[in-house]
Amino acid sequence: MGRVVAELVSSLLGLWLLLCSCGCPEGAELRAPPDKIAIIGAGIGGTSAAYYLRQKFGKDVKIDLFEREEVGGRLATMMVQGQEYEAGGSVIHPLNLRMKRFVKDLGLSTVQASGGLLGIYNGETLVFEESNWFIINVIKLVWRYGFQSLRMHMWVEDVLDKFMRIYRYQSHDYAFSSVEKLLHALGGDDFLGMLNRTLLETLQKAGFSEKFLNEMIAPVMRVNYGQSTDINAFVGAVSLSCSDSGLWAVEGGNKLVCSGLLQASKSNLISGSVMYIEEKTKTKHTGNPTKMYEVVYQIGTETRSDFYDIVLVATPLNRKMSNITFLNFDPPIEEFHQYYQHIVTTLVKGELNTSIFSSRPIDKFGLNTVLTTDNSDLFINSIGIVSSVREKEDPEPSTDGTYVWKIFSQETLTKAQILKLFLSYDYAVKKPWLAYPHYKPPEKCPSIILHDRLYYLNGIECAASAMEMSAIAAHNAALLAYHRWNRHTDMIDQDGLYEKLKTEL
């Protein structure tokens, strides 16, 4: 009798373990980790992905990270007379928890973003100028726009509050198979609607005036994304959040996060250009034929290749930016036509010709940054004094009136245009680049899953392009790759996560 009971208990225990392994990620039986993972692109997305993949798959996985240019990607710097200045992504929001965690884990130092007073120029006059006094700024804003600035702040806060849910989801290891499903999990149909409507349409419907949109909102879009209020409403909200106080940067340059993550992930950097990726059947050391991805790349004039279990593409699939070909996939990998915005960053060390913007004497000008409206005939999007990446404080007052100014423009500035902007200048350096997507809603985001074990990070940029967005996309892709490798389907695309996790508190 005792033997029968023991066998029955043993059978029930076995059944329970089987059921648990099918439905419980904590108790699930894990597959052996992959042997090799390739990541293409060593910007913030690629290096973040390497960091998270190492955390999930463990120390024995070999991770190769391909980069044809410098580690850091679009987090580039420019040199002016021996000093480095941020060329692109320069400020980080205090609620960007991924970037904050990276800086803490890597032991990096931070600096507060350059301050100073800001003005808005409409092509004829400064329609708004900041004051050193907070109460004066409030009076100016209320006098000109009523309480629209307060309403705008509340609108952005509401979007950010919902967006912050992603950190809780990812802390519980939940992943999403598409950008749309990720956004829907955060803000439901409202967030998807924002992706498919212009910022202008959204804010007009909310009752904001044309004057406020042209003078307060459009200039922010022009400086952050080189575009107008015709961008989608979601990226518009992300852009407006960058107007908050408490913005910061990494001392020494934001690109140090990328090199730090690369080192922390113990990945192998391959300084080469990936030419194509092809799925092939290969016999592994176990003796079983396995589907793998052959990555063919070029170092100098030499062409090489290697095989990988998982591949993450962390560079825009744009012919002008990566030019990767996908060979012999069935079905074929979809081609994306995500155009990227051409922008030119120019750094000039010189004395600003303030008479362009104001009739006040040069010593009474007082503004550190000037943004422009859409209907401005001026050939720049913005101009502002910048600190080098090593400076912990704002630049000291100049004894000769010269500062380093950063200018964003749609086209390369001519010498005549620089001479119009400056009374005199000592040095000028420019960087034309494809900095972020050209937003034209409705937006259809590229797939995250390109093939069985082939993933694409940069589709998140169709919603919004920012350092934090890339880090979040990298974490999501790493979780997605891990769960799909281990067949944890219950950790992907789960409905009702907000309510579910709220009840677990």
Curated annotation (Swiss-Prot):
GO terms for cellular component: lysosome. Keywords: FAD, Flavoprotein, Glycoprotein, Lysosome, Oxidoreductase, Signal. It catalyses: an S-polyprenyl-L-cysteine + O2 + H2O = a polyprenal + L-cysteine + H2O2; S-(2E,6E)-farnesyl-L-cysteine + O2 + H2O = (2E,6E)-farnesal + L-cysteine + H2O2; [(2E,6E,10E)-geranylgeranyl]-L-cysteine + O2 + H2O = (2E,6E,10E)-geranylgeranial + L-cysteine + H2O2. One of its GO terms (molecular function) is prenylcysteine oxidase activity. GO terms for biological process: prenylated protein catabolic process; prenylcysteine catabolic process. Its EC number is 1.8.3.5. The keyword Flavoprotein applies. Its cofactor is FAD. Its main location: other. Residues 1-27 form the signal peptide. InterPro entries: FAD/NAD-bd_sf, Prenylcys_lyase, Prenylcysteine_Oxase1. It is an enzyme of class 1 (oxidoreductase). It is found in: Lysosome. The keyword Oxidoreductase applies. It comes from the Eukaryota. Belongs to the prenylcysteine oxidase family. This is Prenylcysteine oxidase 1. It comes from Pongo abelii. The gene is PCYOX1.
